[in-house]
Every structure is written in structure tokens, then in C-alpha cells.
Regions:
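Phosphate-binding and adjacent anionic-ligand microenvironments
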Residues: 1-134, 140-141, 145-160
């Protein structure tokens, strides 16, 4: 589900499933919806669920053990609203060409998932004149620098 569309995603999954399909949880980095408790974003419920999991699953370390943590970065590149579409069109080819070893997904921007588990997502802001870069990698600075160069060139071409 794309960022900003949690409720639409919940409805889509329910409609696509069978009569017994349940969506237990939907989230963005700053929004958590526990559908059994309601259709609203609920941080207090998230705290309660996490507390229960910590108590029943052997502590926070046990919950975190299967997760590989990598540095994460979000960066914004200035881009006039009227240039976003052209910049993103160019990035559909340019970003994968720069990171050819990765798998590409263009559902919600341009995302490249790399064999080492790192990833970069480039998408236009829906509210501000920026193209956003989101990345997670052991060397996140290098990945962001590479993406920034590609995004900067696409924005420059789109504004000229």
C-alpha cells in the first residue's frame, strides 16, 4: 500500500480476499491501525500491543533478533511541482541503470531492492516541492549520495 493510503489498502485487501479475510494491522512509519480495535490510527493501542508482545515473547531483544538493522536515511531534493512527473519518468530508467544489480518496483515511486538487503525508494512528495529519497543500507551515505546524483540530474533535466 502506498504511503498515505492505509485505509484504501485495508479496503482493497478485504475486497480481494475471501469472506474470512482479515487485515490485522496496517502501518506507515508514523501511523498504526489495529483493525480489530478500530479503523483509526492508534499509537496507544500500538504501545499496548508491543507491551503484550514483550511480556509474552521473551522481551524486546527476542522480538528484534530476526530483524537486520541497517542505517536509514531520508533526504529531500528540491523539485518544482510541475517538474515532478517528468523527473519521475526519467528516474524509472535512470535509477535502475545506476543500480543494475537490484530488483525494481515502480508501484509507489522507483524502488530498487539490492541483493544485500539494502534498498532505495525515490518518490515525489505529495505536499511539498520535493522528490524524496528513502534508503536503508550498511553504507547508507554512499547509497544516498548515488541516488541524490541521479535524482538531481533528473530534476535538472525536467526543469530545463
Amino acid at each position: 500500500v502506498r504511503l498515505g493510503a492505509l485505509h484504501e489498502g485495508i479496503a482493497r485487501e478485504r475486497a480481494a480476499g475471501s469472506a474470512d479475510t482479515e487485515v490485522a494491522f496496517a502501518a506507515e512509519p508514523w501511523k498504526h491501525v489495529h483493525t480489530a480495535l478500530g479503523r483509526w490510527i492508534d499509537g496507544v493501542a500500538s504501545a499496548g500491543v508491543l507491551s503484550a508482545l514483550v511480556a509474552t515473547e521473551g522481551g524486546l531483544d527476542a522480538l528484534r533478533a530476526p530483524i537486520t538493522e541497517r542505517p536509514y536515511r531520508k533526504e529531500s531534493v528540491s523539485c518544482p511541482d510541475d517538474a515532478k512527473a517528468a523527473a519521475m519518468d526519467a528516474l524509472e530508467d535512470a535509477l535502475p541503470a545506476t543500480l543494475p544489480e537490484g530488483d525494481v518496483n515502480t508501484d509507489y515511486g522507483v524502488r530498487v531492492d539490492r541483493p544485500d538487503g539494502s534498498w532505495v525508494l525515490v518518490r515525489p512528495s505529495g505536499t511539498e516541492p520535493y522528490v524524496r529519497i528513502y534508503a536503508e543500507a550498511d553504507d547508507v551515505d554512499a547509497l544516498v549520495a548515488t541516488a541524490r546524483d541521479v535524482v538531481g540530474a533528473a530534476v535538472e533535466d525536467a526543469t530545463n
